[in-house]
A protein has these predicted regions:
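Upstream accessory/linker segments immediately N-terminal to the RecA-like ATPase cores of bacterial MutS
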Residues: 1-70
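N-terminal pre-P-loop "Q-motif" helix
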Residues: 64-88, 102-103
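Conserved hydrophobic/aromatic pocket- or pore-lining residues that grip, position, or stack substrates
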Residues: 71, 96, 174
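Pre-Walker A (Motif I) flank of P-loop NTPase domains
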Residues: 83-94, 102, 115-117, 170
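Conserved SF1/SF2 helicase motif Ia
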Residues: 89, 103-132, 140-145
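Conserved glycine(s) of the Walker
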Residues: 99
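AAA+/P-loop NTPase substrate/partner-engagement loops
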Residues: 125-130, 137, 148-157
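Conserved motor-coupling elements within RecA-like helicase/translocase cores
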Residues: 152-173, 180-189
Length: 189
């Protein structure tokens, strides 16, 4: 069958040498783009968040479960990244139920304590609602204002949340791709 336009060449033929040269050229272009991207990242200035406050410690102590060693290591690494004046470039991966949300919650709290707003993107409306409740429950005693933006909110509610977000009256917004819409503006993300 047709393999999507792939063509097999016999080694050593003119077609093989031509294909090999084309691939080498493309690889050089990709390598050049990657080098330029990493150079740009290296020069980029980020926002250096302050060291943990006593409230951060109190907030973290309010976690009702025992953290795993991996969770504690990830939390420490993320917070160290946040305290650097370079944009963070980190991907956190883990199976369901292994504490990724708590890592995000602590980073979000640190960001809010550092005077910034936080946008937390969830892949589904149901997950956005669950994460919103978890963020809200964890932040409730610390005066952090958390809202959710998704299709479960009426257009009127969405408009009000967006207005408050732009005014800086919302610290953390949890939502689906809706939070990426052009009408969603932040005071200081």
């Amino acid at each position: 069958g047709d393999e999507g336009g792939l063509k097999i060449n016999k080694l050593g033929t003119k077609e093989w040498l031509k294909t090999k040269a084309k691939v080498k050229k493309n690889l050089r272009e990709v390598a050049k783009e990657l080098i330029e991207l990493y150079a740009k990242r290296e020069k980029a200035q980020g926002y250096a968040f302050p060291k943990d406050t006593p409230w951060q410690t109190q907030f973290e102590d309010s976690f009702p479960y025992q953290e795993t060693d991996d969770q504690l290591r990830c939390i420490d690494e993320v917070k160290k990244d946040m305290e650097m004046d370079k944009p963070m470039d980190r991907l956190l991966c883990g199976d369901v139920g292994y504490g990724k949300t708590e890592v995000a919650i602590r980073a979000a709290f640190k960001a809010v304590m550092g005077g910034k707003q936080v946008a937390y993107l969830a892949p589904t409306t149901v997950l956005a609602e669950q994460q919103y409740k978890e963020f809200k429950d964890r932040m409730n005693n610390f005066g952090v204002k958390v809202e959710v933006l998704n299709r479960f909110r009426t257009p009127k509610q969405q408009k009000e949340i967006i207005k408050r977000l732009k005014l800086g009256e919302v610290d953390i917004i949890v939502g689906t791709h809706r939070i990426l819409s052009e009408d969603v503006e932040f005071k200081d993300l």
